[in-house]
From Swiss-Prot:
Function noted in UniProt: Catalyzes the transfer of the diacylglyceryl group from phosphatidylglycerol to the sulfhydryl group of the N-terminal cysteine of a prolipoprotein, the first step in the formation of mature lipoproteins.
Protein name: Phosphatidylglycerol--prolipoprotein diacylglyceryl transferase
InterPro entries assigned: Lgt
Location(s), subcellular: Cell membrane
A GO term from the CC aspect: plasma membrane
Pathway where this protein functions: Protein modification; lipoprotein biosynthesis (diacylglyceryl transfer)
Alphabetized Pfam families for the sequence: LGT
Amino acid sequence: MGNIQYLAAIPSPPQGVWHLGPVPIRAYALCIIVGIFVAMKIGSVRYQQRGGNPDLVIDAGIVAVIAGIIGGRLYHVLTDNQKYFCADCNPVDVFKITNGGLGIWGAVALGTIAVYFYLKKKGVAFALFADAVAPGIILAQAIGRLGNWFNQELYGRETSVPWALEIYYRVDASGKFAPLTGHSTGEVMATVHPTFLYEMIWNLVIFAVLLWADKKFQLGHGRVFALYVAGYTAGRFVVENMRADDATMVFGLRINVIVSVVVCAIAVGALFALRRGRESISS
């Protein structure tokens, strides 16, 4: 990338991993953990307000987290398989999820499916539950995007805008290039669009919209969840087109762009097709 001088820019963290003795403390993992707790707390409060048992959110949340991690990693590995199964790659890296690489599509899809069957076994209505937890999920996604900032990943094309993000050259203790686990040398490799920040801000906007729309229109029967999916995928479509990292291409488009369009269309259709009004826990 070019050696362009910028008047202002957003610095990346000098590192994304700290060590407590032999134990690595990864910012990416911490952001995900904080997001999970925030989502569970908000979901518990909202589900209780709808007449549900808040403890169920915690139980279902554990199911969702386990399934989400598996689904997210599977989606990432399948759609970015060239990063793990090439001549110079180490397939063992597939299991190093703390280094980053959780596809949100796979996480939400498998997490949702797992929770659906868990609630069905418990005899609990899925739609009411999904509406209660949807705002917390999008807020958790916003928090999780901070992990990409620490990892210096998922950024956009080079730019000279004042809010551009500086990507530092990081090395490990031996001086080898280590973008995820190393420490910054102070050298700026590139100044790019902070797409992680764009998506984080968009997710915060959707969080506010969900709370507002839910209160104003008394949404129910799965419509809050549908609005969440539609809102998130619309923003992801825009952000995905700004990213510069390697991606699997289908018909000349990034695969996540195609997924965004398809899922958004389904969610919008569901939003208008689902029943109006809000159901009670006993209905």
